[in-house]
Amino acid sequence: MTSEGYHSERGAILENESPSEAVVTFFERFNDADELSLDEIFDRPWFLITGDAARVFQSYSEAVDFQFLRDSGWQHSRINTMKSIHQDNETSLITFNFSRLSKKDHEIYRADATHLLIQRAGGWKIKTVFINGEMTLSLD
């Protein structure tokens, strides 16, 4: 099947997802370390705001280094809580708390985050990621 929005390699139809489902899909793909599929969830450019730093990226794969994360002890991440703050036809604001976990399921990082999503022809896309505090995705 090759209709727009259908991705047979993942079996997901992005355009039918709600903003909250898009955030859950982000975590699933992050846990799979699937950089190409992660790139499809993000708008271009997208913005990462952590602590007092604001950065601009053209793709998610430009921002993340999964080997760096594995070397830091990361095995997978999980959403602890999630809440929709706002949604209209064009934008959505989702806040959530998440953890990074080790192979033994020990929590090695926890943070509050907010995703600003925008509606595009292919579905909801993450435009801005706000992290309350510091967070690293790579050595850069």
Language-model region placement:
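Short, low-complexity N-terminal intrinsically disordered segments enriched in polar/charged residues
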Residues: M1-L48
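Short, mixed charged/polar active-site loops
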Residues: A54-V56, H106-R110
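Surface-exposed, charged secondary-structure patches
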Residues: E15-S18, F47, A63-H106
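Short beta-strand segments enriched in hydrophobic/aromatic residues
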Residues: F42, F98-R100, F130-N132
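A short local loop/turn or secondary-structure capping micro-motif enriched for an aromatic residue
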Residues: F57, L101-K104, E134-L137
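Short beta-strand edge/turn micro-motifs at domain boundaries
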Residues: I108-D140
